[in-house]
Each structure stands twice: as C-alpha cells, then as structure tokens.
Amino acid sequence: MGLDIVVMERKAVRCPHCGEVINTVDIASTDSGGRLWYDFLERLGYYVPYEKRTEKNDWYGKDMVLDNEQAKQLTDYAMQKEVYNWGGVERVVTEALAHGNKVVINADW
C-alpha cells in the first residue's frame, strides 16, 4: 500500500458574539501520494516508523494543522520533489495563506 495525502484549506467559524471558534469548514482540498512524501512527513513529525510509534506520536489517518512556516515548507517540498499533483498542493496552500486560513494534512500509508 502506498502513501496517500490530502492537503486541505480549513477556515475557522467564529461565534458572532464572543469571537470564539465554534466550528471549522474545509474550503478546498487536493490529493497527492507516493513515497517521496515520507521524508517530509517524517521531518514534520507526522510519519513515525512503526517501531518508534507511540500513542502520543501516532498521526496515522489523523488531521495535522500546520503553522504558516510548515505550510510554506510543504509547498516548497512538493514543488522541488515534483510530487504527484504538486500544482494542486501549491494552489491549496497559497489560497489558504492568502485567506488567513489554516493548512491541514491527513495521510495514510
């Protein structure tokens, strides 16, 4: 089984009265995949080899919200390595950052 990754733009929905985040909405997403992603996801702390996996660092199939710097690194990596659908990854990340939204990844392998 190969690695599949979804890159999403996620917007926070805030309460009009207090401004607290009450929900989130996924605005856009794109799919990618392939073994080239393992290196980036391992450096990010998302992918941990099975032997080193604990309950605390097991992100398999879970959403990880990236900060702006990590999101930029994601785009740079996708473009440099020319991963599958790197243009879609660049588009989702660029739009998310332009709109002040979060970039979220979810992968399984």
List the model feature ranges, each with a label.
Residues 1-109:
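Acidic (Asp/Glu-rich) sequence patches and key acidic residues
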